Amino acid sequence: MCQRFGIDVSHWQGDFNFANAKNNEGVEFAIIKAGGGDDGLYKDSRFEDNYRKCVECGLPKGAYFYGNAKSVADAKKEAEYFISILSGKKYEYPVFYDVEGKMITDNDRATLTEIVKAFCEIMESAGYWVGIYSSESFFNSEMNDGELTRYSHWVARWGKSKPT
């Protein structure tokens, strides 16, 4: 398997220097936080600037949305909102549904799987290359991952100093 070195960036990183990351740190792509649903529906305050900086330095990019859906109806609202943020922009990497936190604790396995599928189906029908971000243990124990294999997987391995 070919490994590439990428980063995820949100407002938490502040005024991030993508050109330096690409030219001096070996970063090959960035996945930018577009928004989330964990505090009402919102757009990440740095999204537009982060997107622009990636374009300016030629860094390939994708985007992600931090989910908080408690039902299929919520997931559909989150997907439509995500589409509104992404509209008019180009992505070389998938757009991801970030599945962690309260989505895991507030939903049973079958419900969470249906929520994730609903979100991804809407994104895919809008023409996006869609993926799911979660930890390996969440993919294995909190979702019916066999029903989600058609979507790209970005597997979190928190606490590692280097990708494995």
Enumerate the predicted regions with their spans.
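Conserved, mostly hydrophobic/aromatic
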Residues: I7, A21-K22, C54, Y97, ...
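Glycine-rich anion/phosphate-binding loops
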Residues: K43-R46, A69-I83
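Surface-exposed substrate-engagement region within the catalytic domains
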Residues: N24-V27, E80-V95, K102-T164
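Solvent-exposed loop/turn segments at secondary-structure junctions
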Residues: H11-D15, G35-L41, G67-V72, G101-I104, ...
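Boundary/entry segment of secreted carbohydrate-active catalytic domains
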Residues: M1-G35
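Acidic (Asp/Glu)-rich catalytic clusters
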Residues: F16-G26, R46-L59, F82-Y91
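Metal-dependent polysaccharide deacetylase catalytic core of the NodB/CE4 family, i.e.
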Residues: C57-A73, K89-D106
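Hydrophobic faces of well-ordered beta-strands that scaffold small-molecule active sites
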Residues: F5-V9, E28-I32, K61-F65, V95-Y97, ...
